[in-house]
């Protein structure tokens, strides 16, 4: 468990991200893809159902022992809350109500945020725009680990700890890498979340709150679904910085596994991404892909060639306009 990862720096490149050029080529060749840039008609009802399920779970766990509460938080609540974060990811691209109803999308993301226990949705959108525009951008893409993470989490034991602590790194890293002013919507997100938490505590006590928070921290940490964090952009094969996964866990994660397709067409909802691959298979079938998120986690921990440094990084010029 003591072997150090082989890399001592990121994979620096001097080319633009591949998604921009591929998007232009595909739209020229298959203009019908534009028809997929429309709202997901089902995401509203799916999210509503998941939020209500977690509220019901708060009532059910109020009398459980702490041991069983944490078990169900990992095995059940972790799946629901992680799935909700991926719904928020999809909604951040205005897929619930369309681009003409940006405010509705923002508030619906705040609603989807409720069972997560901590205000997250608005801040996520603020930084996720940069992740797409400046993929791998030094000091801009906060999805890239810090130099400290790459240096310190370099052995199997430390990489395992890094996976457990993923929720904390994803929350705190933006404040260090690319701090931005707090927005009015972020404050409103926090106030709504606080009101929800106080209501849950008043109704069913501290165990309900612990269940929600544990569902988020455990579900976003060392959990099978969390394999997507590593699978999406960590360089398992030199020269490739984005990877897709086409397995069954897409059914509960809003097709986040179709990640190459997503970066090619961020405005297409997850529910339609399989159609992109069907329309233009020659752009995707030859690319390296993952077949198991659990195996991704295993390989990340035990392969010396993999670690937090296994990311493509580039210098990016700031764009004048905003997405």
Curated annotation (Swiss-Prot):
Entry's localization field: Endoplasmic reticulum membrane
Main location (coarse class): endoplasmic reticulum
Motif (Histidine box-1): 89-93
Enzyme class of the recorded protein, top EC level: oxidoreductase
Motif Histidine box-2 boundaries: 128-132
GO biological process: ceramide biosynthetic process; sphinganine metabolic process; sphingolipid biosynthetic process
Stored InterPro entries: DES1/DES2, FA_desaturase_dom, Sphingolipid_d4-desaturase_N
Keyword terms of this UniProt record: Endoplasmic reticulum, Lipid biosynthesis, Lipid metabolism, Lipoprotein, Membrane, Myristate, Oxidoreductase, Transmembrane, Transmembrane helix
Cellular compartments per GO CC: endoplasmic reticulum membrane
Lipid attachment points (N-myristoyl glycine): 2
UniProt membrane topology term: Multi-pass membrane protein
Pathway the protein contributes to: Membrane lipid metabolism; sphingolipid biosynthesis
Enzyme Commission numbers on file: 1.14.18.5, 1.14.19.17
Catalyzed chemical reaction(s): a dihydroceramide + 2 Fe(II)-[cytochrome b5] + O2 + 2 H(+) = a phytoceramide + 2 Fe(III)-[cytochrome b5] + H2O; an N-acylsphinganine + 2 Fe(II)-[cytochrome b5] + O2 + 2 H(+) = an N-acylsphing-4-enine + 2 Fe(III)-[cytochrome b5] + 2 H2O; N-octanoylsphinganine + 2 Fe(II)-[cytochrome b5] + O2 + 2 H(+) = N-octanoyl-4-hydroxysphinganine + 2 Fe(III)-[cytochrome b5] + H2O; an N-acylsphinganine + 2 Fe(II)-[cytochrome b5] + O2 + 2 H(+) = an N-acyl-(4R)-4-hydroxysphinganine + 2 Fe(III)-[cytochrome b5] + H2O
Record field: transmembrane: 41-61, 68-88, 200-220
Keyword set includes Transmembrane: yes
GO molecular function: sphingolipid C4-monooxygenase activity; sphingolipid delta-4 desaturase activity
Locus of motif Histidine box-3: 259-263
SMART domains recorded: Lipid_DES
Transmembrane helix recorded as keyword: yes
Annotated segments matching region Required for C4-hydroxylase activity: 95-99
Protein family per UniProt: Belongs to the fatty acid desaturase type 1 family. DEGS subfamily.
Cited PANTHER family: SPHINGOLIPID DELTA 4 DESATURASE/C-4 HYDROXYLASE PROTEIN DES2, SPHINGOLIPID DELTA(4)-DESATURASE_C4-MONOOXYGENASE DES2
General function of this protein: Bifunctional enzyme which acts both as a sphingolipid delta(4)-desaturase and a sphingolipid C4-monooxygenase.
Protein name as annotated: Sphingolipid delta(4)-desaturase/C4-monooxygenase DES2
Species of provenance: Rattus norvegicus
Lineage of producing organism: Eukaryota, Metazoa, Chordata, Craniata, Vertebrata
């Amino acid at each position: 468990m003591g072997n150090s990862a082989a890399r001592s720096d990121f994979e620096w490149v001097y080319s633009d991200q591949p998604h921009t050029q591929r998007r232009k080529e595909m739209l020229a060749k298959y203009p019908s893809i534009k028809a997929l840039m429309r709202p997901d008609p089902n995401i509203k009802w799916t999210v509503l159902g998941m939020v209500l399920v977690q509220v019901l779970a708060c009532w059910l766990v109020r009398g459980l022992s702490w041991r069983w509460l944490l078990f169900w938080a990992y095995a059940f609540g972790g799946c629901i809350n992680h799935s909700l974060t991926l719904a928020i990811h999809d909604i951040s691209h205005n897929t619930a109500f369309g681009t003409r109803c940006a405010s509705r999308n923002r508030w619906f993301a705040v609603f989807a945020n409720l069972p997560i226990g901590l205000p997250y949705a608005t801040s996520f959108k603020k930084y996720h725009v940069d992740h797409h525009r400046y993929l791998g951008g030094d000091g801009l893409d906060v999805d890239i680990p810090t130099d400290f993470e790459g240096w310190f989490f370099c052995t199997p034991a430390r990489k395992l700890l890094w996976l457990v602590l993923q929720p904390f790194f994803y929350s705190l890293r933006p404040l260090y890498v690319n701090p931005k002013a707090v927005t009015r919507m972020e404050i409103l997100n926090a106030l709504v979340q606080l009101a929800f938490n106080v209501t849950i505590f008043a109704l069913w006590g501290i165990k309900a709150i612990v269940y929600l928070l544990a569902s988020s921290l455990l579900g976003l940490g060392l959990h099978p679904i969390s394999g997507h964090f590593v699978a999406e952009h960590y360089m398992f094969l030199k020269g490739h910085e984005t990877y897709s996964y086409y397995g069954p866990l897409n059914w509960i994660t809003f097709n986040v596994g179709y990640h190459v397709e997503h970066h090619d067409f961020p405005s297409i909802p997850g529910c339609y991404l399989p159609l992109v691959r069907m329309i233009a298979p020659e752009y995707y079938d030859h690319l390296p892909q993952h077949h198991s998120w659990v195996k991704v986690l295993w390989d990340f921990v035990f392969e010396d060639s993999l670690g937090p440094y296994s990311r493509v990084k580039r210098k990016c010029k700031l764009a004048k306009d905003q997405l």
